[in-house]
Amino acid sequence: MAVVTQVVRSEWTKIRSVASTVWTLSLAVVVTVAVGTLLSGLANSQFSRMPARERLSFDPTNISFAGMTLGQLAMIVFGVLVVSNEYSTGMIRVSLAAVPGRATFLFSKIAVAAALVLVVGMVTSFAAFFLGQAMLGSHRAHLGDPGVLRAVVGGGLYMTLIAVFSMGVAAMLRSPMLSLGILMPFFFLVSNILGNVDATKKIGRFLPDQAGSHIMQVVPRVGDDVPYGPWGGLGIMGLWVIAALAGGYVLLKRRDAQ
């Protein structure tokens, strides 16, 4: 137990001493909150001109999280750099020499980074919600309304899982450029295409971001017939995260440090 505590402290020192930690997490907060606030204000100004069908399905809570699409990209960068920086700098050899137990090394790093992201994600989610609702005026939702608190807490969990999934992928690929070169297009382009094209919707709905984002919905979308609820979607996302971490651990255990 003493060894694990020492490793956790070491990983915390590494993470907080790297400049990328500050700018990636700060960017995630600023972008998510700013875009959500802006689009909430726009929705309020355009609400009376919306078609009746759109007004009936309008989700004031979810519009606050419109910035998550961009904010999650910063979380992906953070997750990748937390793991891959040690490979790109060569520090992985020193780290594994100091901590021979590879499970202890990897999961201590993941635990520290995930705890930090969870705090940042929750702050971001609550800030985006309250500022977004302030911009919505009479169309706002309240934290005590049915499903709203679940959606706001879920927003923080969603950002955390995105970052941890990225850590698992980076542990498998080791290269920051390769990891980002796969994850960025996957979440920003491929997932959206698969989720919006009729022929591939049934596949796209089970991708991590598509499934996980349902936790932030309070009002169901028109025509949304997914076979899972908000927590079920987050559970699917959790399975993707577990698979990525398992793959990262297996490859770390089998490969030489380099």
Regions found by a protein language model. Give the residues of each.
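Aromatic- and glycine-rich beta-strand/loop motifs that create alpha-glucan
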Residues: 1-30, 174
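Generic structural signal for small/hydrophobic residues in well-ordered secondary structure
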Residues: 11, 99-101, 169, 175, ...
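A residue-level signal for alpha-helical anchor/packing sites in multi-pass solute transporters
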Residues: 82, 91-93, 130, 168, ...
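Secretory targeting signals
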Residues: 20-80, 106-172, 188-194, 198, ...
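Juxtamembrane transmembrane-helix termini
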Residues: 41-48, 85-88, 201, 250-257
